[in-house]
Structures are given as C-alpha cells and as structure tokens.
C-alpha cells in the first residue's frame, strides 16, 4: 500500500493501522508507527500516513491517530515532515507542536537516476555497498569522494519539519 500511495514509499514499522471500506474490504488509509528512531527520549514515531492514491478520506488521519492513542497509550510521539512537499498542516490539525526545522539532508543518484539513501553509504557500510556494485572503495577518501569518484551525484533536499506530541499529562490525568 505504501509503495503505491506514499511519496517516500514503505519503511519498516512495528505498528500499522488502516481504514477499510466496510463494503469492499479495500484499504483507503494507513498510518504506521514505530519506536522513535532518532531520539530515544521519545517513545514512538509516526512514520507514514497516506490515503489511497486519488482519494481524499476526510478525517482518516484523526481516526487512525486516535485508534493508536487508545491502543498504545503513548507518552510521547514525534514525526518528521519533508519540507520539499509538506508545510506541516496535517500535524497542526492533529494538535502536534512544531519543534524545529532540520538542516538539509543529502542523497546520491546513480547514472540510471536511482536514488541511494545516505544511510546506505555511511562510511562503515560504504565498502560493502560499492563492492556489491563492482565499484572501487578507497579507504583514504571520504564517503562523498568515494561516491562521486564512482559516478554518483549528490543532491540535497530542504530538510524536515519536526513535530512532537506529549501525552504524559493527558493520560496521567485520565488514569486518576
């Protein structure tokens, strides 16, 4: 579903919630969550949300987030909106708090215009990555210089918007 309907495609998620059409059983919206990847002080991360392509499902994000909140009773939740295509309107509508903008991220593109994540090319992974493609790895070069020397181009996006939701007070108040 995510590969076909989300701009960034699929990413691993331990929690996947969806809205189904009661008549057809088809999925119209999905929201995925996992443990926070970058900040271990935050319990969960909202990883992906999307509707079926060419469909606008009114209230879907709110319904899926409420289902997650009821089932998992999170203490904190973070999400990242790519600034290339989001202004963060959904997060504001879901009562998230804007925390900050991140610096631009980078990625590589090969001669066939395939995008390569910077995560795949971290220095400790780079030798295996390049050798798996029958390319040359030079220990004395940086990640960037190794990639460019092997014909990749580097591109930058505009970074992310970081949104946060704190539930500690909300759930503690309802438990008393």
Identify the residue ranges that each predicted region occupies.
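A conserved beta-strand-loop-helix scaffold within acyl/acetyltransferase catalytic domains
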Residues: 1-106, 113-116, 146-169
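Intrinsically disordered, low-complexity and often Lys/Arg-enriched segments
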Residues: 169-176
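Short, hydrophobic/π-rich interface segment
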Residues: 101-146
């Amino acid at each position: 579903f995510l590969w076909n309907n989300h701009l960034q495609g699929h990413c691993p998620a331990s929690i996947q919630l969806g809205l189904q059409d009661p008549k057809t059983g088809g999925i119209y919206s999905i929201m995925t969550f996992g443990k926070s990847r970058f900040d271990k002080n935050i319990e969960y991360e909202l990883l992906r949300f999307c509707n079926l392509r060419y469909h606008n499902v009114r209230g879907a994000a709110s319904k899926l987030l409420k289902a997650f909140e009821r089932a998992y009773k999170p203490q904190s939740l973070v999400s990242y909106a790519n600034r290339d295509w989001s202004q963060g309107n959904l997060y504001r509508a879901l009562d998230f708090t804007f925390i900050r903008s991140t610096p631009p991220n980078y990625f590589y593109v090969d001669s066939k215009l395939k995008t390569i994540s910077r995560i795949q090319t971290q220095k400790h992974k780079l030798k295996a990555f390049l050798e798996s493609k029958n390319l040359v790895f030079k220990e004395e070069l940086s990640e960037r210089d190794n990639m460019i020397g092997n014909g990749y181009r580097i591109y930058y996006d505009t970074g992310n918007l970081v949104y946060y939701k704190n539930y500690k007070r909300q759930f503690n108040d309802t438990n008393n």
